[in-house]
């Protein structure tokens, strides 16, 4: 018993001490220094046996999700909340180029309520003005508030927490100066002109992006269900944002012109990690898009290239659950990796987008994650991602697992959206 207590004390110190969080190795950008590593096969269960039929997939998928939830993202509450939708604006798209009557702007207040507490999320939806039938919808969170995604003066300025480093943000609150500051990431005309709707909400409406001990945002709806030393497997902020995306899917199902059978989730960077986790858990998302999601997203952690587990846990200790810290500078001990996250989306299509200059996100690690997830798709007779070497820039490859390496930096640009739209069409969405 004394030995067991001593061992537990040692593990506790290694995982949770400030020194352990600060003493991390520098990033590796040399392929020759990538360690040799093994990956668990995506069809291999806890008994070491591989499933061989689509009928066995639901159980295997649940096994993968359980590993990822308990060891990385955190377990989210399963208790439902009341989701109500109130339309607060309905008009035409207005921009510096004038009013575009072919694009309809609608803004909704989505209220999540439980046990006398409530949280409001502002949902912005752009769609064709007069579609002949219900339309498919891309759903994604934004970083700076809905007003940052368009220069339309009618879009409400977010009142929730914003990162003070962003332009037009004062004392962690958005101002008019932030309007349209990220409209290049949301090419509304191109998306709606392709026949789709696009919906977005500010990630800060769901949970503010700082280490607050899980007190704010939708965590306030579940005060008894916080990640802590006593409960290290509970939801971190990425799992919280993903849970919020599912609640927004609940809301979109209530909008008459949205085809609830054609919901697609998309995200960039940390919100790409979020989109993957949301898509893996919620089968209502018929297509999942990860853009430059990197460590904790599409990139294989065991490659130890670019951002490491230790680096991400040190910089963003709230993103993942506390158990994930056990793998700081110890990726070789991980009994899982991100290819299992991609596989958990099967047989639904998933698209992984990288950028050529985004070494921090490890483009090759993102590609290889898709490659090693492919057996889950092949189980259903679908093509996955055969490539193990990066393709030439600005070329889309793959089957039900799509991939491209866009030329340029860590960003979400019109080229990326062009590929996402083409991929959606390819898969009949």
Where are these regions (language model features)?
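Alpha/beta-hydrolase fold nucleophile elbow
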Residues: 257-269
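Conserved strand-to-loop "acid loop" that flanks and positions the catalytic carboxylate
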Residues: 346-361, 406-408
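Glycine-rich nucleophile elbow surrounding the catalytic serine of serine-hydrolase chemistry
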Residues: 267-277
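N-terminal pre-domain segments of enzymes
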Residues: 22-77
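Cap/lid segment of the alpha/beta-hydrolase catalytic domain
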Residues: 137-254, 260, 297-303
């Amino acid at each position: 018993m004394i030995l067991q207590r001593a061992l537990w004390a040692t593990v506790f110190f290694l995982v949770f001490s400030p020194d352990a969080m600060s003493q991390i190795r520098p990033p590796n950008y040399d392929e020759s220094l990538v360690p040799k590593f093994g990956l668990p096969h995506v069809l291999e269960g806890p008994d070491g046996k591989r499933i061989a039929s689509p009928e066995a997939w639901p159980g295997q998928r649940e096994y993968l999700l359980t590993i990822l939830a308990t060891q990385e993202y955190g377990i989210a509450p399963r208790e439902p909340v009341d989701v109500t939708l109130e339309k607060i604006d309905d008009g035409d798209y207005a921009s510096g180029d004038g009013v575009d009557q072919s694009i309809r702007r609608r803004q909704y207040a989505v209220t999540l309520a439980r046990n006398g507490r409530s949280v409001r999320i502002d949902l912005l939806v752009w769609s064709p003005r007069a579609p002949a039938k219900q339309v498919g919808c891309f759903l994604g969170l934004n970083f700076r508030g809905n007003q940052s995604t368009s220069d339309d003066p009618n879009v409400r300025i977010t009142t929730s927490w914003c990162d003070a480093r962003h332009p037009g943000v004062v004392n962690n609150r958005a101002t008019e100066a932030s309007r349209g500051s990220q409209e290049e990431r949301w090419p509304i005309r191109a998306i709606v002109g392709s026949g789709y709707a696009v919906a977005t909400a500010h990630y800060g409406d769901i949970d503010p992006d700082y280490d607050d001990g899980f007190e704010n945002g939708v965590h306030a709806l579940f005060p008894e269900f916080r990640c802590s030393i006593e409960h290290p497997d509970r939801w971190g902020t990425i799992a919280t944002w993903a849970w919020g995306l599912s609640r927004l899917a609940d809301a979109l199902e209530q909008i008459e012109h949205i085809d609830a059978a054609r919901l697609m989730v998309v995200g960039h960077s940390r919100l790409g990690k979020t989109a993957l986790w949301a898509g893996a858990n919620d089968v209502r998302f018929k297509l999942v898009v990860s853009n430059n999601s990197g460590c904790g997203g599409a990139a294989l952690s065991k490659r130890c290239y670019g951002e490491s587990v230790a680096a991400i846990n040190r910089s963003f200790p709230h993103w993942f659950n506390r158990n994930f810290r056990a793998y700081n500078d110890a990726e070789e001990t991980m009994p899982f990796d991100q290819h299992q996250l991609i596989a958990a989306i099967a047989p639904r299509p998933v698209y992984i987008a990288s950028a050529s200059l985004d070494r921090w996100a490890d483009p090759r690690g993102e590609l290889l994650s898709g490659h090693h997830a492919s057996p889950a798709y092949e189980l259903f007779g679908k093509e996955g991602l055969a490539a193990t070497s990066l393709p030439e820039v600005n070329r889309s490859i793959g089957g039900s697992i799509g991939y491209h390496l866009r030329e340029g930096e860590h960003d979400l640009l019109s080229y990326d959206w062009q590929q996402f739209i083409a991929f959606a069409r390819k898969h009949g969405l």
